[in-house]
Structure formats: C-alpha cells, structure tokens
C-alpha cells in the first residue's frame, strides 16, 4: 500500500487536500490490484471549487476569444505530446486495451478540443434594423460556472467533450469524474493549467456516492449540468437541476440500439460492422448496436460469419500490444453483465459463442467476460430490452422492412441506429423512420468532433459535439438601441 499514490482534489490550478477525511481506491480491473487512492470531496470542498470557478471565470471571460483559442490549442498540443502516457494510465484505470486507448480515447478527445478552440472566435451575435432610427443587436454571453459529470467508460474523452465547448464559450467548469475511473481527468486538469488556463476555470472534484453530484446539481451558482450516465441517474440529476435553480441540462444517457442488416447487404461487411458495434471497448459503449436484426433468409450465413470473427478477437492483458479486448471496467459491473447472460440462457436464447467469464490463466484475476453472441432471441427478453453495457450481442430475425422498423423503434431508448444495405434509397428510407439521434449507414461508431451526438426518448436531452452544442454554453442578450427621439404616452 505504501507504493500507492494518494490523489487530492484539483482546485484553482493546484492539488488541494480534501476536507472530508475520506478516501476511495481505483482498481485495475485486469488484475484487481489497487492502482491509486483518491481523496473524496466534501460539501465544503464543492463550495471552494465553486468560489474558485467564479473567480477564474471572470478572468477567462474577459480575455479575447483569440486568447482563449490559443490557450486551448496549447492544451491540444500537450495532449498529443503525452498521448501514450495518458493512454497507459487510461488502460490501467479502465481495463481497455492500450491498442484502443492510444489510438482513440486521447486522440478523439484532443480532436474535439481543437475543434472548439477553432470555434471560440466564431461566437457571434447579430444586428437587426427595426426602422431608420432604431435597431437591436444580440450578444452571446457565457453562462458562468457549469458542471460536468462523467461516466466511467471514456473518462478523458468525456471530460474533453464536456469541457471543450464550455471553455471555448468563456465558462468555467467543475468536473466530477466517475469514481470508478477518475485518474485521467486529474491529468487533464494539470494540462489545462500548464497550457495557461486561469486558475479555477477547470476544477476536478472526485468521490464515491451520489452526494457530490447532488451538491453540484443543486448549487445555486452553477448554471448548467452536463451529465453522461444511466437513465435512472440522469432523471434524478435532471429533476434536481430543475428543482434547484432551473439549470440548463445536457443528458447523454443509455441505449439499446438497433443494427438492421438488409437482405441485399454484403455479408462480410455486415458481420464486420456487427462485431465492431458490439465488442469494441469490450462492449462498453453507449451507442453499441446490441440488437442486430437479420433477414430470416440470411440468418444462418450471418451467424456463421459473426462467430468466425468473434473467434479472432484477442482477449488478454490490456497492456499487451496484440490485445484488442480487455476486461470490463469493474468487478461489480462484470457481475451485472454475467447476470444478464444467465438471464438470456434462462429465457431461451441460444449461445453461439462465449456466454460466461474468461477464467483461463491470468485472465481469472480480472473482470473479463467473453465476447458473447446470442441467437434465437425475442423482443421480450431482458437481454434485448435492457442496456447491458457489455460484450453481449443479440441476433433477431425479421421478414419485412415494415416489421423491422416497428420492432427497432419498440424501445424506451433512442440513442443510435444503423442500416447495412447496398440500396442507398432503402438506407435513407429506413433511417428516416428510426427514432434515434445518431445513425450510421454501412458503418458504425465514428463520432467526429463536427457531428452532434445525443439521443431521442429516454436516451438523452441536448447534444454534445458539433456547432449546435457551443450555443448551449451561451445565453443570448438582446439590446435595442433608439437613435431618435423617445416619445412617452404619458
């Protein structure tokens, strides 16, 4: 234990002792070892973070947009210089394969920051003439202090997705990472400070339990909450935010997304997409296409192609260069996923491959679940209805286009969807009828910085990334100017 580093809170440009006296551990899910101990924030610490953010935000907002842009661009450069170092830490904390974290997590997060750094100077109002002697103009002003609450599956990427538009618009952010994977958010705070961000503009407060999130959502100074996580927690966060000071919210919640394979689809392409849409990041992606709809006439061939590809997945030590599938992010989550797999078996689904925990050799020490494919699934099964957030694919057969559209939409979620077909007219026809916020045709999973992402139904409120998101970190002030005489009716 003496070799385990203790991490403090990051407030006002430096590490500070938490006042709670409580700590919690970060666990390497590949072997169960403690990799860090973290101090837990108290309500007093949240107050200090808010006060710091208020001070820093005034300095930050007073800078020119070009000055803010330059500082954010410097942070991008540092992120890219330290990509491998950050990726190793992300792998230790999350269990994701280093081959993934080194090429995706930091890379795509830095891309989003670079995108918004470029847009910082493009925040504009408008001027509208009313008559010869009068006009009005608008200003887009920062909200002030905002809060981000992150999820455990993409820690640094989510921290960047939330902080980039907020900071570009002139706000300060208090960020709470998931207690399961909190380490890279602290490194991001260091990088922002090194890049020249004024003290207090990005503070990190970590801790286990719901209290920290509640303190943030109910704090009267905080103007907006951006949350990524589960639906039930999201509902509570949204209710708390509305019940305190009517805060603005962005909610990126769960999904149970349909992937529709059409009868004319190239089978190899369809199988490749289905495997990526279910097993990338060990299945821990909110947009995963876990309900795979296949025409009855293609079902047997498709299942064979999928199983062949799953057999090629390299499960192993996430730090090994050839591993492309690591453990789940925590042992409690592993147990949850395994319980869903057992439910699928009990409800009559057929296991084509996988179906349990990986227990061979060193894998037995970690939170490893084998890539699992179920066939003979029905829409009523728990594995088809509920978000599992693990490496579990459910294959469902269908006969007509009308049928598959209806079944694809028969869910409380609406985050993502995909269609694989060689008929582009059919692709658009289907996608336009699917109730989902992020859709892919003949591909899956890419979320470029320029593309807004978010869900329909209970999968979320608002969007992240893209031009539209920047506007939601500002508020519009309208100013009318009268150049002529003023005439009162009194």
Curated annotation (Swiss-Prot):
Binding site for K(+) 2: 246, 457, 460
Gene Ontology annotations of biological process type: glycine betaine biosynthetic process from choline
Residues reported to bind K(+) 1: 26-27, 93
Pathway involvement of the protein, from the record: Amine and polyamine biosynthesis; betaine biosynthesis via choline pathway; betaine from betaine aldehyde: step 1/1
Chain positions with Cysteine sulfenic acid (-SOH) modification: 286
Top enzyme category: oxidoreductase
InterPro entries given in the database record: Ald_DH/histidinol_DH, Ald_DH_C, Ald_DH_CS_CYS, Ald_DH_CS_GLU, Ald_DH_N, Aldehyde_DH_dom, BADH
Binding site for NAD(+): 150-152, 176-179, 230-233, 254, 286, 387
Keywords assigned: Metal-binding, NAD, NADP, Oxidation, Oxidoreductase, Potassium
CDD domains: ALDH_F9_TMBADH
One Pfam entry name: Aldedh
Cofactor section: K(+)
EC assignment: 1.2.1.8
Residues carrying the site annotation Seems to be a necessary countercharge to the potassium cations: 248
SUPFAM superfamilies: ALDH-like
Active-site residues per Swiss-Prot or TrEMBL entry: 162, 252, 286, 464
Catalytic activity: betaine aldehyde + NAD(+) + H2O = glycine betaine + NADH + 2 H(+)
A GO term, aspect molecular function: betaine-aldehyde dehydrogenase (NAD+) activity
Purpose: Involved in the biosynthesis of the osmoprotectant glycine betaine. Catalyzes the irreversible oxidation of betaine aldehyde to the corresponding acid.
Subunit structure: Dimer of dimers.
Family: Belongs to the aldehyde dehydrogenase family.
Protein name per Swiss-Prot or TrEMBL: Betaine aldehyde dehydrogenase
Lineage start: Bacteria, Pseudomonadati, Pseudomonadota, Gammaproteobacteria, Moraxellales
Gene: betB
């Amino acid at each position: 234990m003496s070799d385990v580093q203790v991490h403090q809170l990051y407030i006002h440009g430096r590490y500070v002792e938490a006042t709670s006296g409580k700590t919690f551990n970060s666990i390497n899910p590949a072997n169960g070892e403690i990799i860090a101990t973290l101090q837990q924030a108290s309500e007093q610490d949240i107050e200090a973070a808010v006060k710091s953010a208020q001070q820093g935000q005034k300095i930050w907002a007073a800078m020119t947009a070009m000055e803010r842009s330059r500082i954010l661009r410097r942070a991008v450069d540092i992120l890219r210089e330290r990509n491998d170092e950050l990726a190793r830490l992300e792998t230790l904390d999350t269990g994701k394969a280093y081959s993934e974290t080194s090429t995706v997590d930091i890379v795509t997060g830095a891309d989003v920051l670079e995108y918004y750094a470029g847009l910082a100077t493009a925040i504009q109002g408008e001027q509208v003439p009313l008559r010869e002697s009068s006009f009005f103009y608008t200003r887009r002003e920062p909200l002030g202090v905002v809060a981000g609450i992150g999820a455990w599956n993409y820690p640094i990427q989510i921290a960047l997705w939330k902080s980039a538009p907020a900071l570009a618009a002139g706000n300060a952010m208090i960020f709470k990472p998931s207690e399961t994977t909190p380490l890279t958010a602290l490194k991001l705070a260091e990088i922002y400070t090194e890049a020249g961000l004024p003290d207090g503009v990005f503070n990190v407060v970590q801790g286990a339990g719901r209290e920290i999130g509640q303190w943030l959502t109910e704090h009267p100074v905080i103007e907006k909450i951006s949350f990524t996580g589960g639906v039930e927690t999201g509902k509570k966060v949204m209710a708390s935010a509305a019940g305190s000071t009517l805060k603005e919210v962005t909610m990126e919640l769960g999904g149970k997304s349909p992937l529709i394979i059409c009868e004319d689809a190239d089978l190899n392409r369809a199988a490749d997409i289905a495997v990526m849409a279910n097993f990338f990041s060990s299945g821990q992606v909110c947009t995963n296409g876990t309900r795979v709809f296949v025409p009855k006439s293609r079902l047997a061939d498709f299942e064979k192609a999928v199983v062949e590809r799953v057999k090629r997945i390299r499960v192993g030590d996430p730090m090994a260069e050839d591993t492309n599938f690591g453990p789940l992010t925590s042992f409690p989550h592993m147990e949850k996923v395994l319980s869903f797999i057992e439910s699928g078996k009990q409800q009559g689904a057929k296991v084509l491959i996988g179906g349990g925990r990986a227990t061979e050799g060193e894998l037995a020490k970690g939170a490893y679940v084998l890539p699992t494919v179920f066939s003979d699934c029905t829409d009523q099964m728990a594995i088809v209805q509920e978000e599992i957030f693990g490496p579990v694919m459910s294959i469902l057969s269908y006969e007509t286009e009308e049928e598959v559209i209806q079944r694809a939409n028969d869910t409380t979620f609406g985050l993502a969807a995909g269609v694989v077909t060689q008929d582009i007219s059919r692709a658009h026809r289907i996608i336009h009828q699917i109730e989902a916020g992020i859709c892919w045709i003949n591909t899956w999973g890419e979320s470029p910085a320029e593309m807004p992402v978010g869900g329909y139904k209970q999968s979320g409120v608002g969007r992240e990334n893209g031009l539209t998101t920047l506007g939601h970190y500002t508020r519009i002030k309208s100013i009318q100017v009268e150049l002529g005489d003023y005439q009162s009716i009194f």
